[in-house]
UniProtKB/Swiss-Prot annotation:
One of its GO terms (biological process) is endocytic recycling. The gene is SNX3. Belongs to the sorting nexin family. Keywords: Cytoplasm, Golgi apparatus, Lipid-binding, Membrane, Protein transport, Transport. This is Sorting nexin-3. Required for retention of late Golgi membrane proteins. Component of the retrieval machinery that functions by direct interaction with the cytosolic tails of certain TGN membrane proteins during the sorting/budding process at the prevacuolar compartment. Binds phosphatidylinositol 3-phosphate (PtdIns(P3)). It holds the Pfam family PX. Residues 39-162 form the PX domain.
């Protein structure tokens, strides 16, 4: 009788056995897209600035950006952002858009605030991370923002976001 193997185990073995060389480019081509911008929100961390005290606690998230867009100085970047940074980013986007020739870009609502008592529970933090990831993917996926928003570039690539 054959031993049961999960799909992921089988795939992992196949990938390990596969050659690591990149396949030759074909005329039909599945090359890297001409222009791309990928963003991820992951690795939430809760910080305790005052030791064991709950005073001043906050959670931040790792924002990873991969792109080949000419308006982005770095091809790959990682920055940490708090929820309040996302709120500030949204306000800065509104201001930038109101001063530009494209004020009709719709910026979706951020995921809602969390009840104070539950904001550091793991499942609540994960739910917020998922919401922020979806929100940022939507915003960063807008073609007008990809090509013309200096605020988007700074939010995704500057170590400290100042708007």
């Amino acid at each position: 009788m054959r031993q049961f193997q999960s799909f992921s185990t089988t795939v992992e073995r196949e990938l390990a056995a596969a050659p690591t060389a990149r396949p030759a480019r074909t005329a039909a081509g599945y090359d890297e897209p001409e222009n791309f911008l990928e963003v991820e929100v992951r690795d939430p961390r809760t910080h305790f600035p005052h030791g064991d005290s709950n005073r001043g606690m906050y959670t931040d998230y790792l924002v990873v950006c991969r792109t080949n867009l000419p308006s982005f100085p770095q091809r790959v970047s990682q920055v940490r952002r708090r929820y309040s940074d996302f709120e500030f980013f949204k306000r800065c986007l509104f201001k930038e858009l109101s001063l530009s020739a494209h004020p009709r870009v719709v910026i979706p609502a951020l995921p809602g605030k969390i009840l104070w008592a539950r904001r550091f529970h793991d499942e609540v933090i994960e739910e917020r991370r998922e919401g922020l990831a979806q929100w940022l993917s939507t915003v960063a996926g807008h073609p007008l923002l990809q090509s013309g928003s200096k605020v988007l570039v700074r939010f995704l690539q500057d170590e400290v976001f100042n708007g």
